[in-house]
Amino acid sequence: MEIERKFLIKDLHSLPFSIEDYPHRELEQAYLCTGPVVRIRKDDEQYFLTYKSKGLMIREEYNLPLNRQAYLHLREKADGRIIQKTRYVIPLDEITDSFPSQKESRLSPQFKEKGVSLFLELDIFKGDLAPLFLAEIEFPDEETARSYQAPDWLGEDVTHLSLYHNSTLSQLK
């Protein structure tokens, strides 16, 4: 089960941190089908086939490993554009601890007591989708996702807009 919220970041300069301070990976993904979603992804030098059910904030997700040869074979059969992006992974606790003005983005105490740690996955799209910046936060459960108060710098919450699903972006003309 994947439970996530997605945000549209307008300007990387508005972020309260420097992305260069965090690790990143190069992603390439393509879609064999968009309803249901069947995706292939190259994540640095790892390869995956993913199935995602319908949904916006909550979806079933299954990942299967692929080898490079299988990935390249399936890539030739992809529909639409092949999406390329750089993904930065940023621990949200680190941001809220370092920037007192961001304290309002913290989880409520009952979630902190459960040991919930959240990570921001910031995608910087390349090619004809640039300059698009999307941030995703994956949550352990629906209650945590719904109660999370996003800081202003995350921008517009586009979780419920299918336009910002990568599967939709792959089909845009």
Task: Please place each PLM-identified region on the residue numbering.
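Phosphate-end processing signature that detects enzymes handling 5′-triphosphorylated RNA
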Residues: 1-173
